A protein has these predicted regions:
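Outer-membrane beta-barrel translocator/receptor signature
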Residues: 110-112, 124, 133-142, 147-234, ...
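Membrane-embedded beta-barrel scaffold of Gram-negative outer-membrane proteins
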Residues: 330-334, 340-346, 351-358, 579-602, ...
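N-terminal Sec signal peptide and the immediately downstream disordered periplasmic leader
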Residues: 1-66, 72-76, 234, 245, ...
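Periplasmic-side early beta-strands and strand-to-turn transitions of outer-membrane beta-barrels
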Residues: 159, 168-169, 175-177, 189, ...
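Acidic, small-polar-rich N-terminal luminal/periplasmic segments of exported/outer-membrane proteins
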Residues: 33-167, 624
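Structural signature of Gram-negative outer-membrane beta-barrels, strongest in the C-terminal barrel
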Residues: 239-241, 405-409, 460-644
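Gram-negative outer-membrane beta-barrel transporters
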Residues: 27-28, 399, 405, 479, ...
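C-terminal beta-signal and adjacent terminal beta-strands/loops
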Residues: 748-767, 793-846
Length: 846
């Protein structure tokens, strides 16, 4: 379905639409303080309508209404936010704001959208995958936020605040959910005052288990499911407040996210399959892909049938396991009646691991994980420590709101992975060469060596240290006119290394000897020149090839590395805001933001002598906005227009055989955002949000001196950046007699077409081919509409409630990532997004 501007605007004009109430709703569904929404987007508690910043604030009620239980689902409540996921739960989540994010399957890449939970930075999206429960507020801060939030917020930030312990009242809640795919969820919290008005404890927990929605099959039938949930979280807090105003909050949490995640669905068949090459090579008619799919790039019916079938062909079911624990401490110490000292410190230990089939077929070709039973520590560990100290307050009778602070973080990454070739690898390479070199070309050209069992255990380490000093100050120059100046000096240093713990080279040595012109065994032929590239990359497959062979100096083979990256940057912002009527404010701002560079932590990073480092990303952002309320605060309207210009934009792409990192000299995002809430009565609320975003690589994004893969991006839209997104819905609530109440809620989310791959077309091999290479098939996800509905009934005091709900009512199957299937000659595969979900939720409060 293709959407144009006219279609989106017509739909908005013709239908009363609404997004979630952007934190308008409070406990018990009643508005408070004339709909004042308090946020901490500027590190102070402020009315969201008073700050010169584009921010969407979402209440816990609205998160529940739209079924948002993790950061990956925030796009359901924010039109400017999106996320996508690929093969693993912990390492391939990509978050985007205004179409900008860091596409990555690499632990060395850091997100362009920073995540902060209770003021503490979460270093990777995978670290923040635990369930949303007992949340006080979610803030989506749009645009670069580096002045106050620091590192890696070049696209924006998520500021998540959990509920604090209540020093006075005992209470809590319990929620229980059951839905399709055997979706079982339990959430709860209990608050216990230990010393009245002084000390309290709060314990929060959540458990969720759901079957996967993608079937995994081989020749024997279904062998499992992926895209499942199996997770739990426990969080304990202590809150303290002295008579003198000293406040202390200590938070400990532990969580696990397990299950099978995630399997791609083949959407376009390889020409080797449709041409009968796999069959002729003894690999079966389909070459290990058992599910019908499109046979040509124009076969949209085949594409849709493949996606709707939600079935993947694999020899193993992908598994992912995450566990982490962390501690956060916050101290607020009053220095005077107008100044406070605030400290936030955190420590987090995160572990993840995954095993699975990386060729995405039922053939025995290529796997990752500890399959050999060896005593190797396989997986990723990230230890992160952060400290932030701020002094802030007011001066000149409240005319000046000032803040100064310092920040330090220390992070250690230790990531090891085991990869191995399977028994059918050589036969598969023979099919890739369409029989021109016989049924087992690697054995032929390596002197009889079998590549089956070739494996390597690769280890990547990185230590990152960052420190900064910052200030953020707002001065009311005259009544209604405020100026804000923010500065942050940031210093980053990283030590990154790749070492190979173990390697079984298999046939690689024989292939290298052949290519390098070494002596041949009796009957061993020399590799023809035309076949050298294919035989080298398949005989020495980069993920299993031995590192630092003598031939690595001249051939594209893995090399270990041990290096240093350092950078410093001055981040700054300037804003002017004018309140020309009590509820109406206009503002303009400029912000210079920054995201640190670092290391491509991958075995292919230094192939051919390449520099494994990538440069820091910078952004200059311009924004003007309007924040207004009308009709006795019954109508809220917020509008923002923005231009964001990126330099050294960080990109990672998978070529089908290796991961490549590079910086694109230019990228940009421009657009307009509109959010509005209308309350015609106490019982009825309408909200709407519309985002227009033109996020792209400009036509002059690179020069002739840049690599062809960089030049090829010029003129293309950024990945997963639809031009139009509209979210809307309505909520009606009413009483049933004197003891019960009910509500009805509906939401619709529409988006226009979006690209789902890094490259828009087949990467050119020569400069002359730029602009003439064919578009990659099925790169574009068509525009779509998704509808959520929820209805509930319960006690008027919220003592109990029952709700029925459905998300993605029409079962619209979309895809977040589309890629060229590993070494499969033109095949394309995609990771499908969540289908229709429905169920019942019971709520109790005490």
């Amino acid at each position: 379905m293709n959407f144009s501007k006219r279609i989106v605007l017509s739909a908005l004009a013709g239908t009363v639409l609404a997004t979630p109430a952007f934190a308008q709703d409070q406990s018990g569904e009643t508005a408070a303080d004339d709909n004042v929404i308090i946020v901490t987007a500027q590190r102070r508690a402020q009315d969201v309508q008073d700050i010169p910043l584009a921010v969407t604030a979402v209440s816990p009620v609205q998160l529940e209404r739209q079924g948002v239980v993790s950061v990956t689902q925030i796009g359901q409540v924010s039109a400017s936010f999106s996320s996508s996921n690929a093969q693993t739960a912990g390492g391939t989540n990509v978050l985007r704001i205004r179409g900008v994010g860091t596409t990555s399957n690499n632990i060395g890449f850091e997100s362009a959208v920073g995540i902060f939970i209770d003021g503490a930075y979460q270093s990777r999206p995978g670290v923040a995958l635990s369930e949303f429960v007992d949340v006080e507020r979610l803030e989506v801060l749009r645009g670069p936020q580096g002045t106050l939030f620091g590192r890696n917020t070049s696209a924006g930030a998520l500021n998540i605040t959990t509920k604090r312990p209540d020093l006075n009242e005992f209470g809590g809640f319990v929620n229980a959910t059951y839905g399709n795919y055997d979706n079982i969820g339990i959430q709860g919290a209990v608050n216990v005052p230990l010393i009245q008005d002084t000390l309290a404890a709060r314990l929060t927990g959540a458990y969720r288990k759901r079957d996967g929605f993608v079937r995994v099959i081989n020749e024997t039938g279904e062998i499992g499911r992926t895209n499942e949930l199996d997770q739990f979280l426990v969080r304990g807090q202590l809150g303290y407040e002295s008579d003198g105003g000293v406040k202390v909050r200590l938070i400990f949490d532990y969580s696990e996210v397990n299950g099978n995640c995630c399997a791609p669905v083949e959407v376009l068949k390889s020409g080797l399959e449709t041409g009968g090459v796999f069959a002729a090579s003894g690999l079966g008619a389909t070459g290990g892909q058992l599910v019908p799919a499109a046979t040509t790039p124009n076969d949209t019916a085949g594409l849709n049938a493949a996606l709707d079938g939600l079935t993947a062909s694999q020899s193993l079911v992908q598994t992912s396991n995450l566990d982490q624990w962390g501690i956060t401490g916050e101290i607020e110490f009053p220095l005077s009646d107008s100044a406070d000292l605030i400290y936030i410190g955190s420590y987090r230990d995160f572990n993840s691991g995954n095993t699975g089939d990386s060729d995405f077929t039922t053939l025995d070709l290529f796997h990752v994980g500890n399959f050999d039973g060896g005593n190797r520590d396989i997986g990723t560990n990230i230890k992160t420590m952060t400290h932030e100290l701020r002094v802030q307050g007011e001066a000149f009778d409240g005319k000046l709101d000032w803040l100064i602070g310092a920040y330090y973080s220390d992070e250690d990454i230790d990531s090891s992975g085991f990869s191995q070739l399977g028994t059918q690898w050589d036969q598969f390479v023979g099919a890739l060469l369409q029989g021109s070199a016989g049924p087992a070309p690697i054995a032929l050209f390596s002197g009889g060596l079998n590549p089956a069992g070739s494996n390597a255990t690769n280890r990547f380490t990185q230590n990152s240290k960052s420190w900064s000093i910052f200030t953020h100050n707002t001065l009311e120059i005259v009544d209604g006119l405020k100026a804000t100046i923010g500065l942050r000096y940031s210093d980053e240093s990283k030590d990154g290394a790749f070492q190979q713990l173990n390697s079984n080279p298999g046939a690689c040595g024989g292939i290298v000897n052949n290519v390098a012109g070494g002596p041949l065994a009796a009957g061993q032929p020399r590799i023809p020149g035309a076949l050298v590239p294919t035989l080298l990359i398949t005989g020495c497959f980069p993920f299993v090839a031995p590192a630092d062979l003598a031939a690595s100096a001249v051939l594209p083979l893995p090399r270990t590395f041990n290096g240093n990256f350092s950078d410093e940057e001055l981040i700054y912002t300037g804003k002017l805001a004018y309140e020309f009527a009590d509820p109406i404010t206009i503002y303009g701002s400029f912000t210079h933001g920054y995201k640190s560079g670092g290391f491509n932590l991958d075995s292919t990073a230094a192939i051919g002598g390449a520099d494994p480092r990538f440069a820091s990303e910078e952004v200059d952002a311009y924004e003007i906005g309007l924040k207004a309320k009308f009709l006795d605060n019954a109508v809220t309207l917020n509008v923002a227009a923005f231009i964001e210009e990126f330099s050294n934009f960080q990109v990672l792409e998978f070529t089908g055989a290796q991961f490549q990192t590079f910086n694109v000299p230019k990228a940009e995002s421009t657009g307009v955002e509109i959010e509005s809430t209308i309350r015609p009565s106490e019982n009825l609320t309408f909200n709407m949000a519309l985002t227009y975003t033109d996020a792209k690589y400009p036509n002059d994004c690179a020069t002739a001196a840049d690599a062809l893969r960089v030049q090829n991006l010029c003129g293309a839209a950024l990945t997963n950046a639809p031009k139009y997104v509209a979210i809307g819905g309505a909520t009606y609530r009413g009483d049933i007699g004197d003891s019960m109440r009910f509500f009805l809620n509906g939401q619709i989310r529409m988006e226009s077409d979006r690209r789902t791959s890094t490259q828009p077309s087949t990467p050119p091999t020569t400069a002359a081919a730029l602009g003439n290479t064919p578009l990659l098939p099925f790169d574009v996800q068509d525009g779509n509409i998704k509808i959520n509905l929820r209805a509930g009934i319960g006690d008027i005091d919220d003592a109990w409630g029952i709700e029925a709900w459905v998300t993605n009512l029409t079962n619209e199957i979309t895809r977040g990532v589309t890629f060229s299937t590993t070494l499969r000659g033109g095949s394309r595969s995609a990771f499908p997004q969540e289908p229709r979900m429905y169920g019942l939720t019971l709520r109790g409060k005490f």
